[in-house]
Amino acid sequence: MENSRVLSCQYRSSFGSSNARRIRAKSEIPAVVYGQGKDVSHLRIKSSEFNKKFAKFTDNTVLILDDGKLERCVFVKDVAENIASKLIYHIDFYEVDRNVELEKYVPIKLIGASIGVKEGGILTVLKEQVKVRSLPLDLPEFIELDLTPVNKGDSVLLKDLVLPSNVRLAENDENLEVVIIK
C-alpha cells in the first residue's frame, strides 16, 4: 500500500462537543466514517499526520484508515475548519469497498503548449472533468491531456484521452469534444 495514502486512526467511544474539545487539546482531530450499508464509526486522528497529507488531497484522493486491525478505504467527504486559525475541527470520511468499481468525475489537467495556440489559435476548453470507472485505489487524481501536438482547427475528443490501464471512460458519448483550437 502506498504509504502516502495510509492514515493512522483510533476508535473513540465518547462523543459530544466537550469530548471533541478534549481530543483537539491533545492535538488530535475527531472524525466519523460512514458509508452505504455501513455502521457509523467515531475516530480520532493525529493532527500532524492529517495536516501533512491534507495539503496533497483532491476530491479523488482515496485514503486508507488504519487502526492496527482493520484498513478502511475512504474518501474525505467534509472537513470542518476554522479559516482564520486553520484549525481542523472535524472530518467526515466516506467508506467504499475497495473491490467494487465506482464512477467518479476526475479533472482534466492540460499540459504542454499547443502548436495551434503558438500559431495564433484560441484554445477553448469544453470539458474540465471526465467521468471514469475504476476500483477506488486505481482512481487517478486527474487525467493529463498533452496539448503539444494539437494544431489550429483540431479538437480533442473524450476517446482521445489517455487513461491509466485500470481506468475506463464512463461517459455516454466518447465523441464529445474536450478542447478545440480555432
From Swiss-Prot:
Lineage top rank: taxon: Bacteria
GO MF annotation terms: 5S rRNA binding; structural constituent of ribosome
Keywords annotated in UniProt: Ribonucleoprotein, Ribosomal protein, RNA-binding, rRNA-binding
GO biological process: translation
InterPro entries: Rbsml_bL25/Gln-tRNA_synth_N, Ribosomal_bL25/Gln-tRNA_synth, Ribosomal_bL25_b-dom, Ribosomal_bL25_C, Ribosomal_bL25_long, Ribosomal_L25_dom, Ribosomal_uL5_bac-type
Cystines in this chain: none
One cellular-component annotation, GO: cytosolic large ribosomal subunit
KW Ribosomal protein (keyword) present: yes
Keyword Disulfide bond set for record: no
HAMAP family in UniProt: Ribosomal_bL25_CTC
Record-stated family: Belongs to the bacterial ribosomal protein bL25 family. CTC subfamily.
Known role: This is one of the proteins that binds to the 5S RNA in the ribosome where it forms part of the central protuberance.
Record note on quaternary structure: Part of the 50S ribosomal subunit; part of the 5S rRNA/L5/L18/L25 subcomplex. Contacts the 5S rRNA. Binds to the 5S rRNA independently of L5 and L18.
Protein name: Large ribosomal subunit protein bL25
